[in-house]
């Protein structure tokens, strides 16, 4: 069980980092879209 755990842990950490970066990109895109929207008005 221990070896599989040592492999699983980094994978979950990587997955968390990836989802965090994806979230950040989405937020940035949304902010840019909001700015463009406000500029268009």
From Swiss-Prot:
An example Gene Ontology cellular component term from the record? extracellular region
**What would be one Pfam family of this protein?**
CRF
Q: Does the keyword Phosphoprotein apply?
A: no
Q: Where in the cell is it found?
A: Secreted
Q: Which UniProt keywords apply?
A: Amidation, Hormone, Secreted
Supply the SMART domains for this chain: CRF
Q: Does the keyword Lipid metabolism apply?
A: no
> What GO molecular function annotations does the UniProt record carry, in alphabetical order?
hormone activity
- Principal localization reads secreted
Family indicated by similarity: Belongs to the sauvagine/corticotropin-releasing factor/urotensin I family.
- What is the name of this protein? Diuretic hormone 1
């Amino acid at each position: 069980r221990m070896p599989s755990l040592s492999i699983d842990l980094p994978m979950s950490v990587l997955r968390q980092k990836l989802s965090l970066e994806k979230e950040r990109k989405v937020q940035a895109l949304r902010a840019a879209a909001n700015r463009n929207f406000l500029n268009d008005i």
